[in-house]
Structure formats: C-alpha cells, structure tokens
Amino acid sequence: MGTHRVKGAVLCGGTGSRLRPLTYYFQKTMIPIGLKQKPLLEYVIRLMKYHGVADVALLVNYKAEQIMNYFDDGTRFGVRLEYVHDDPNYRGNGGALLNASRRGVFSGFDDVLIYYGDILTNLDLTDMLRIHREKDAAATLALSTNYTVSVGVAEVAGTKIVSLREKPPLGKPVVIGVLAVKTEVLEILEELAKPQQELDIMQHFIPLLIERGYHVEGYLTDAFWYDVGSTERYEKLDPHVVDEALGFLLA
C-alpha cells in the first residue's frame, strides 16, 4: 500500500444479545467457527493481515478480557493490536468509533478500515482499498450483490398471485458491515455525538456524509459473506462452507 497508511478497526464491544445463551459465556466475536473451531474474530484479523492491514484496533467492552487473553498484542497473528475500551457515555458503534478517534488511535493513518465483528467474509480488501483511494472517496462501503431474501416472495395482480419465488435474490446490493473511511472525516462524528444516546455508523454517520455531498463509494462484490449475529444464523452456518471460503486464512 506504499506510503498510504490504513488502520483496521473491529467493532467488538456488543453484548451479542441475539446470540444468547452463547454470549452468556462467550464474547460474540469469540464464538467458535468452522471445522477448526477458531474464534470468529481470528478470521477477521487474519483477513486484514492477509491484505496488508497489520495495525488493528479492537474496540472492546463486554467480556473484553476473553479477546485480550486470546490475541494478546497480536504478534502470534502477525499484526499489532491495540485495545480501546468503549466510553460508556457514548453508546452504539458510532460512539465506539468516536471514542477511539478522540484517543488518537487513528492519528498518522490516512484511512480506517472498519469491520463489524460479527461478519464473516473473504472480501478482497486490497481491491476495495484500491478503489477507495482511486475514487478519493470519503467512505467506501462493501455491498453484496448476491443477497437472497429469506422468505418466499409473491408477485400479485390485484389479489391474484401470478408468480411465487422461494427465497429469491433481492436484486439490490446490501451493506455487509465492512467499510473504509478517510480518517479526516471522522471528526463529523463529534457533531452527532450526544451523551447516553445511540450513535450508529450506518444509520447516522454515513447518511450525514451523503447529505453533505461527500463522495460515498459502493464497492460491489459477490464474495462470500455471512452475518453470524443471531443464534439461528450461527446454528445454520455450515462449518464446511466456512472452511471452503476462508480456509486459506488458516493454512
């Protein structure tokens, strides 16, 4: 990546309420995944390292000690890890990002690669960051083009069903929880921050960038991705599929 410096930021602070009862015992990013039963977060960190992002901040809160005990300073994984404990006064993933920015975690870096900690993907981060730089975008969001609706969809004429498709492709790209942001635009989070109020990256921060005319790029991909954010989704995740898509990270 030459002199262009990128820092990873993984959102690891959530309590994982939709993953209970697992998260009574595990931090949600530490739940075992795949045939080798490695923590979800290990796949995330190894993917970043694979694509040359070796400086990574883990934004932690709930059961942070599990993450810290397992990954330590990151040497074993070839990365430099920094732990940033969430400020309880600023809630939501946007609050966690603001807190890290205020502490100078991203100083000296041109971009921040933000990764939602309950997402599995083999997304080509190198290519996404290249597009982000070439387009000189304030933010670039990974968008999946292969999302399927989880229910049957009917096409109707009046009340008559003329076609029925079970779990069809959505037909529109969906946000998958990986994005690159210019470090300098993180200061806009300050305008949105209110103590004890939820601040969300996708709900508040990105829409404000768009509203103000900043260039927000979409990086379209058909890469494998999976949201492991609920017990139902976790139980449906085939470990063989994980190893097929992400096994190269553990080789």
Residue ranges and their predicted role:
Residues 135-145:
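A short, conserved acidic/glycine-rich loop-to-beta-strand motif
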Residues 113, 120, 129-133, 146-148, ...:
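Catalytic-core segments of class I nucleotidyltransferases/pyrophosphorylases
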Residues 155-160:
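Short acidic-glycine loop/turn motifs at beta-strand connectors
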Residues 24-29:
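Short alpha-helical oligomerization interface
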Residues 41, 67, 100, 118, ...:
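Residue-level signal for inorganic ion chemistry
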